[in-house]
Amino acid sequence: MSLTPTNEILFHYKSSVKVGELERYVITYHLYDGEEIPPDLNLNSLWLKVRNMNPLSYRAAYLMGPFMLYCDVKTAQYHHSQKIVASVDYPKFEPNVQTQQDFVAELSVHNIRQKYVWIADVMSQILFTTNTNVTYEVTIGTSKESVENPHDLPSHLGSYSPKLTVNRLTTLDLWNLPVQITTPQKKKHLVVLTHGLHSNVSTDLVYIMEQIYKAQKNYPHEQIVVKGYRGNVCQTEKGVKYLGTRLAEYIIQDLYDESIRKISFVGHSLGGLIQAFAIAYIYEVYPWFFKKVNPINFITLASPLLGIVTDNPAYIKVLLSFGVIGKTGQDLGLENDVEVGKPLLYLLSGLPLIEILRRFKRRTVYANAINDGIVPLYTASLLFLDYNDILEQLQKLKENSKKSPLINDASTPVNQDFFNKTFISPLTKMLSILAPQKFPTENGSEIPKVSFFESASSILLPPLPERAYIMDPDSRDPVIIHDKIYNEDDIPQSEFDIEDGFFGKKNILLQAFFAGKKERAKYRNLEETIARRWHEGMAWRKVVVALKPDAHNNIIVRRKFANAYGWPVIDHLIDVHFNGDDDDDNDENDDINSTQVVEPIQSVTEGKKKYRKAENIPQEYGWLNKVETNGVFDEGPTGMISTVGEIVEALAKRGFSAVIDRRNASEDPNDEVLRFEEMNSDLVQ
């Protein structure tokens, strides 16, 4: 007996996600019950559909969104290190489900077993505002036709079949794992993840979070706790100090308790500087903290630790100093602090940060050698590298590549043209000041280096990995091309040594750094000075990687499959930093710290625990906690979008937020959305 259209639908649900939100659906299908296999067993596939329900006209509302979804589905057994034998088990994913578009995937039932389990993720791709959301619906049916054209759906949402169970996990569920009742006595190792510019921790760093948790098996004597601060989302143009202070207060006031005995930091892009400021702030403002907690790992991935001045044209420095991307742009442009008279990144590279960094067990920087249009190699690696060896490894990789070249080889989603016209074109008018330039070379080098425009496009439309790359680990080329520990003695003593010696001025990887006239040379010397300060009295492990585009987001696997080229980088990070070699229950330093006499550090106010700040810190470190007056341009153009959006949201039933909720208007609400964009067109001119 055939199923009717109604009972062909096994599950139907509606939900929505805001910036930094994801929802996971764990789909369990019981093929049969009992020990005996039924004679009439059906092995027909199930079908999954995720539909973006926002109106079609919202595609133009890029500054209030963009209203897009990332979706993927895989079997529960899938792991990227294992070869996929059956092609039907190949993960399905779509990096950019636009409004009124569908993501449809087959859930293959091809073997006789009692239970099948799949995991589907739905992630928001909103970048700029906290007050808009993407509405979507999830449908599971017994045929492709039933999910593509559903009708006569039951009025209630949920599962309509006893064979199908779907568990929905929200962002909070995924980031707050259930407390293990068997480990209350264990010491905790807190791992803090920090996102970069126009990013968020809860979706963009969720892959790293889950991989770190998988390393828990290496730590029988302690419990790993991975957290990230969500309060800086859509605030990232307000400056390193503003963002770092908020992160530090979050660590102290919300995360710390007496069970936390170790701490590690992992920061991507701007997040590397933010976490560095937070560490310095905690060290001085809450001096008791690092007497109670042992610092273990300080890790950055593609972070502009020296700023981004010399790899850009001269006019970029002017734009940064004017605050085109807010206070953050001024920080990255090495603009002098008005009160102190020195750039924040210069101040940050000295005391007190260096003093506490020396106590970390490991300090590691990961840097992209190629295909990163946001953060150049020299600033992500703290400048001093064996560039000749890196160039040699790149040439070997090119010659020995099993597949196509390292650039322009990956498939690109078919809606690239529409996306470029409606999103990238206006966006780059505002953000193009972060565009490392391509300098001509005498020998016509073919070292690939994507532009900022390509990187901006790849945030939401990344060049997709090849099918073989995802299915077969043996098909993947090595990406770690340089992995070395640099001690202070390895650093050249003068600029002369840099230009003519080990670090080769003529190396094409450094041509952008050394190009330019006297004005550029001034900032080059400043960046070199900052780099030397980072190396004083300690060693750094520097890992240089060669990733395909978009390397800046691939290095953190921003989306599990769309940015899969970064899998080996995160594998390396876990293997090196979370391998269990620092797990022990008899750490002498830990025992000393746990019994060390510390001044009273907490008071109770209205039932909430608060930790006291130091009453006085040395005058030379006053820049850490000096209250600043924020100007309107400290937020930059896209930072202001969020602020304006919050104001609009507060005006009841007025403006854009009222339009998207209005159902019975006399006019088509889509027209009002378009008019809203037209009225605010000055934001994108």
From Swiss-Prot:
GO cellular component: cytoplasm; nucleus
Gene Ontology biological-process entries: lipid catabolic process; lipid metabolic process
Alphabetical list of Pfam families matching this protein: DUF676 (PF05057)
Sample GO molecular function, one term: monoacylglycerol lipase activity
Disulfide bonds: none
Keyword Hydrolase: yes
Enzyme class: hydrolase
Keywords recorded for this protein, A-Z: Hydrolase, Lipid degradation, Lipid metabolism
Source superkingdom: Eukaryota
Entry annotation: catalytic residues: S269 (charge relay system)
EC number, as in UniProt: 3.1.-.-
Protein's UniProt keywords contain Lipid metabolism: yes
Family of this protein: Belongs to the putative lipase ROG1 family.
Protein name in UniProt: Putative lipase ROG1
Species of provenance: Saccharomyces cerevisiae (strain ATCC 204508 / S288c) (Baker's yeast)
Gene transcribed to yield this protein: ROG1
